């Protein structure tokens, strides 16, 4: 109860601030990889604060919450039902896909075939999606030029470019 009250008050104040600045229409409250029951509770809190907040989720596909999401990004290997994809397009909602450390292929790890990065856009186009989400751009481990691993994650999962304005073949092929 107290937790919900705090979030509703903060989000309502945030919405007011965004509207005063003219930024509300370009703001999206985003979450990643949350279970459906958590998302349902979260959406209730957000809607109490302001029913017009745009909400984004990168995670599994859940038909039950799909209509409430302005920007929906599902993991590769899952599919949007065709009628849902078409309705979302008609409603000007973003509909994308992503990869993360759990997909060995295709991906953009330091050991991935560079062609996999170029393939990402082709896949998005084939599926008639709005694009591809790469979860991290420059979240470097301690010594990214010497070791691309972060904890137990695959090498390069946490970044696509190197410090000091250095690009990499993975990034160059992704934007190709």
Where are these regions (language model features)?
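Predominantly late transmembrane helices and immediately cytosolic-facing juxtamembrane segments
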Residues: 139, 144-176
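Catalytic-core regions of glycoside hydrolase
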Residues: 1-146
């Amino acid at each position: 109860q107290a937790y919900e009250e705090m979030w509703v008050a903060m989000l309502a104040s945030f919405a007011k601030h965004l509207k005063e600045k003219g930024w509300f229409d370009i703001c999206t409250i985003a979450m990643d990889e949350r279970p459906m029951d958590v998302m349902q509770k979260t959406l209730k809190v957000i809607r109490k604060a302001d029913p017009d907040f745009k909400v984004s989720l990168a995670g599994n596909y859940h038909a039950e919450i799909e209509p409430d999401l302005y920007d929906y990004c599902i993991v590769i290997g899952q599919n949007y039902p065709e009628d849902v994809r078409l309705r979302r397009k008609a409603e000007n909602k973003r509909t994308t896909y992503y990869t993360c450390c759990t997909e060995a292929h295709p991906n953009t790890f330091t050991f991935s075939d560079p062609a996999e990065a170029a393939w990402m856009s082709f896949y998005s186009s084939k599926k008639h999606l709005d694009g591809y989400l790469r979860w991290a751009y420059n979240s470097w481990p301690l010594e990214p030029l010497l070791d691309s691993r972060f904890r137990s994650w695959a090498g390069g999962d946490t970044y696509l470019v190197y410090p000091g304005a250095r690009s990499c073949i993975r990034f160059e092929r992704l934007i190709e």
